Amino acid sequence: KVLHVAPEQCFYPIFKKQQNLNYTTADMESPIADLHFDLHKIPLEDDLFDVIFCNHVLEHVQDDHQCMKELFRVMKNGGWGIFQVPIDYTNKVTYQDSSITDPKERETHFWQKDHLRLYGLDYPKRLEKAGFKVDVFDPKTALGEIDYEKLRLNSSELIFIARK
């Protein structure tokens, strides 16, 4: 069972047609989502999904720790997830300031006008605080030269695999 939060258009048709997957999409508003809900309070039972994808969502939510705990709650024991976020690899800690509400200021501070924080090198620890065990995967080291654009990967981005 796979939960895909804010499903990317490039992956959606590929996953949707896989006969071996019980693939569920979720988003607050997207018309392609099977379910519509707020990630702060997922209206689903505990221990439901083997795999969860939630890419470039946590930087948009009010309480990322609460959302991480909810993702942990609906993940089965032995499950795993990929929860990519923008990370400033020059910052040791995540930067957030709720007083910054102007879109232009948010873009300056958080790299995008609708972001509420900019993660730092503490991102894996933040996932661990929600209960996950985290593995760091460097695609450049592991995969060498690949078509990063086709896979929608940033060649300088690490992938964090969160396990329960």
Which residues make up each language-model segment?
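S-adenosyl-L-methionine-dependent methyltransferase catalytic module, highlighting the catalytic core
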Residues: 62-71, 76, 80-164
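Hydrophobic beta-strand segment of the Class I
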Residues: 5, 52-53
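Residue-level preference for short coil/turn positions at secondary-structure junctions
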Residues: 1, 19, 45-47, 77, ...
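Class I SAM-dependent methyltransferase SAM/SAH-binding core
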Residues: 1-41
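Short catalytic micro-motifs in class I SAM-dependent methyltransferases
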Residues: 56-60
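PRPP/pyrophosphate-binding module of the type I phosphoribosyltransferase fold
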Residues: 53-55, 66
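Activation segment
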Residues: 32, 43-46, 61-62
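A short acidic, Gly/Pro-enriched loop at the edge of an enzyme's catalytic core
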Residues: 39-52
